[in-house]
Amino acid sequence: LGMGRFRGGSMKIAVLASGLFGSVSGSAVANVVGTGVITIPMIKRDGYPAHKAAAIEAVASTGGQLMPPVMGASAFLMAEFLAIPYSTIVAAALVPAILYYVALFIQADLEAARMGIKAMPKSELPAGRTVIVGSHFVAAFAVLIYALFVLRWQPERAALLGAVALIATSLVFGYQGNRPSLKALFSSLSTTGHSVVEIILISAASGLVIGVLNVTGLSFNLTYALVEVGGGSAIVLLFLSAIVCIILGMGLPTLGVYVLLAALVAPALVKVGIEPIAAHLYVLYFGMMSMITPPIALAAFAAASIARSAPMATGWAAMKFGWSAYVIPVLFVFSPTLILIGEPFEITIAIITAGMGVWLISAALAGYFSTQLTPMTRLLFGLCGLLALVPAGAFEGAVWSDLIGVAGGVALMALNVMRNRLAVRSEEAA
């Protein structure tokens, strides 16, 4: 209802819906298939090219695996691996995930502006009551969050309380006059059990893989090889690790991706002094990027089959829309302020400048901000965005990079807004 009132509403609705569903689905491809059959035709109907409609769906669905509090169930395993509270994992993953979706929303908005796509017609917008009718189901989610972060309960105990709250609200309020029968409740429990069994099997199989890797020494050898080839350079090691993560992550569900990479790649990053939580989030991000990175971008290709677009064109468009996921992990590795490690003031500044950087780079990629951007202006937007993205604590003097990037970005934005207003006035005068 709210998104549809603005330009590019269909694409923004797809981003929101796929992100929410993807955070609990545990599979980017399953999320694309589940939500894409609705969102992709809706986006195409608004006038977007088929490959862009498929790409935005693939990127939004993949990002759901990185969005707290569930993160495709990988957050729970990460807490076990690192022996730290689950709430710490969720807090650390929150800002990077928000920046990911902010970049996606901005690109959706600017693409709509560049292509002249208007808001959805009022006749197609749902009535406000349609949204309000099911709002009581949010209570169960609120109970879950309260139990996890306020009461500090273990995830399994908090999930049980959330399930009880969901059943209670269903029985008391129902939905559109319908309340679940006892048979329907038992059927839901059975379906949930089947889903849990899949997760247990994946975790058990992953445990066997880790055991074999440790017994054979392959885990140690890969860690040693990465560190040696990297030659002590963190930048080279991060680049090599990203490639390994993308290759190993191809075709695996989220849990499988994380467990494999946490055992094989993360130790090499920790060995050179990278924060353990930053290292584990780094491998998770690049493992999930295998879903939108050609040549085997399974989520992008699944979306392409629904949109009937060219698979490779969809894959490259998905990489463009999902650019932030290739950059943000590198930033929080060099400066953990983006994962809320550091002084409150430094964290605040890092978040603000990163948000500005995301906006500028998204505008450069879209080629639009208030008006069409020339190639040189796009280059300047991108350069200022990169400078603003660098966290102040990344290296000595990085604060000047932030200041130059933000100041230059604000100046470019102001100039483009003024240019657009002058052009509009000239047209009106003519």
Cite the ranges covered by each PLM segment.
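Alpha-helical transmembrane segments of multipass membrane proteins
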Residues: 19-20, 62, 73, 77-81, ...
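Transmembrane helix-loop junctions in multi-pass membrane proteins
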Residues: 76-86, 149-153, 212-221, 249-251, ...
